[in-house]
Amino acid sequence: ACEEADVLIGASRMLKSVVKEGQQTFAAYKPEEITDYIFSHPQDENIVVVLSGDPGFYSGAKKLILTIRDRLKKSGEPDRVKTEILPGISTVSSLCAKLQIPWEDIKLVSIHGREENLLAAVKNNKYTFTLTGSAADVRKLAKTLIDARLGDCNMAVGAELTYEGEQILKGNVLEFLDYDGDNLAAVLIANPYGGENAVTHGMNDEEFIRGDVPMTK
C-alpha cells in the first residue's frame, strides 16, 4: 500500500521508515491536519496514512476515521472519500513475541485511564500490558505500582519495536523510577502474585528480570 501511494502522511518517524525515493509526503499526525490535507488535495487519489501500533488499540486511526466521517457528513458528499484500514504488526504482539510470552491471557489497559483500573488489572492478572506516551509515563507507572505495594512486580519496556533502534529493558519496577528512554514505549507488567487462578504459559518470573544487560534487538 505504501509503495503505491500518491502521498504518504504520518509522523516524521513513521514516514522515514516507509517512504521511497521521490515519493511525496506530508508530515502530520493530528486527525484534523490529516483530514484537511485529504479534502484539499482531491487530485491525490491514493493517500496512505501511516500510524504505529494496532489500529484497534488506542490508535490514532479511531479519531482519524471519525474526523473524516464528520467532514464527509458536513460536505454533503458521503462518497467523496473512501477509507480502508490495513493492520500491521501490533505493539502487544511484537513485544510479547520478543519476550516469548503468549498474550491470550494478558490484560490490556490504557495508562491514561483511571489509576484504580490500572492497579486493579495488575493486582488481578499475571500480566498487564499498556502503552505510554512519554518517558515520564513509565516513571510514573513504576512509582504508582510501588506506592500501591506492588513493588514485587517486574516490567518489560519496549521502545522502537520492529525498528533498527529497537530496545527492550527488563527489571523490577524500582529500576524504572529513573527511566529516560524513548517516549513512545510499550510496557508489560508481570505480577508474580496476580491472577493466581489464571493459566499463563511462557517465561518464568525470574526470566523476566533484566539481569546485567538490557534485552535488545
Name the predicted role of every residue range.
Residues 2, 91-124, 133:
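Short, glycine-/small-residue-rich phosphate/pyrophosphate-handling segment
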Residues 10-13, 29, 52-54, 112, ...:
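Structural motif
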Residues 35-42, 117-123, 175-178:
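Short amphipathic alpha-helix with an adjacent loop that forms part of the alpha/beta core around
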Residues 46-47, 125-216:
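A contiguous loop/helix-start segment that scaffolds small-molecule binding in enzyme catalytic cores
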